[in-house]
Amino acid sequence: MAVPDRRVSKTRAAKRRTHYSVKLAKPIKAKDGTWKLPHHINKFTKEY
């Protein structure tokens, strides 16, 4: 089993964890003017 050569500081560990956040889906405006999520079917027009 691997053993770390040296201790990772709190600051370095925190810098690495900055990319762990959840990315929120950004709604886009469809052709008909309604807002929808990308890669989802529109409830009204049934378009992808």
UniProtKB/Swiss-Prot annotation:
Keywords: Ribonucleoprotein, Ribosomal protein. GO terms for biological process: translation. Residues 9-20 have a biased composition (Basic residues). Residues 1-20 are annotated as: Disordered. InterPro entries: Ribosomal_bL32, Ribosomal_zn-bd. Belongs to the bacterial ribosomal protein bL32 family. NCBIfam families: rpmF_bact (TIGR01031). This is Large ribosomal subunit protein bL32. It comes from Helicobacter pylori (strain ATCC 700392 / 26695) (Campylobacter pylori).
